[in-house]
Amino acid sequence: MLLIPAIDLKDGRCVRLRQGDLDEATVFSEDPAAMATHWLDLGARRLHLVDLNGAVAGKPKNDAPIKAILDAVGDDIPVQIGGGIRDLDTIESYLDAGISYVIIGTAAVKNPGFLQDACGAFPGHIIVGLDARDGKIATDGWSKLTRHDVLDLAKKFEDYGCEAIIYTDISRDGMLSGVNVDATVRLAQHVRIPVYASGGIAGLSDIEALCAVEEEGVEGAILGRSIYEGALDFQAAQARADELTQ
């Protein structure tokens, strides 16, 4: 079970949002590269970056902190990034810079052909981010709820050749209200590629619940507010996950 610290970038800072609301940002660090090094030192095996300004603008907006993070930890662990990735040139520039995985969210839903092209052009490097509320997909930084069913889209995107799916229950994200294990397992059972849980992970019991369903295809979790506010000790959580799943 891979536990992945999240670094959400807004205006060059490391922040956390509540339910995706940009106006509800808590600043946790003015130095995202130092934060990346902090998680590496605590044993993180991968980092999850989100360009929040980019997600709104539809193009990368935090180039300097992203470069600083890659300079700090890029030789040591894989780094994945999402937010505002709408064209193949952006993907190529990220991969050339040292990013290991690029996460496509809104663009995959609005323009499936783009996702298909990306999976073909950069096999093994494309992860799809599916953000949902009550089983329906949300787009545009979660501001728009669609009629698309999560399971249907996941299967379609798997067929395109994406590497993995990050599933976020947006009603729980940043709320520390507990991970939606049932919905995550339903999705994982529906596809053959790895699924990573995101949103609402509040403490060790959530990690243990996810470890119990690893064999269903839930292979990891993105950790945000819980590890920044101290509700979850990252080192202890990864150690417990290793104990339960190895």
From Swiss-Prot:
Subcellular location as annotated: Cytoplasm
The reaction(s) this protein catalyses: 1-(5-phospho-beta-D-ribosyl)-5-[(5-phospho-beta-D-ribosylamino)methylideneamino]imidazole-4-carboxamide = 5-[(5-phospho-1-deoxy-D-ribulos-1-ylimino)methylamino]-1-(5-phospho-beta-D-ribosyl)imidazole-4-carboxamide
GO biological process, one term: L-histidine biosynthetic process
One Gene Ontology cellular component: cytoplasm
Entry EC no(s): 5.3.1.16
Claim: Cytoplasm is one of the keywords in the record: yes
Location (main, coarse): cytoplasm
Name this polypeptide is given: 1-(5-phosphoribosyl)-5-[(5-phosphoribosylamino)methylideneamino] imidazole-4-carboxamide isomerase
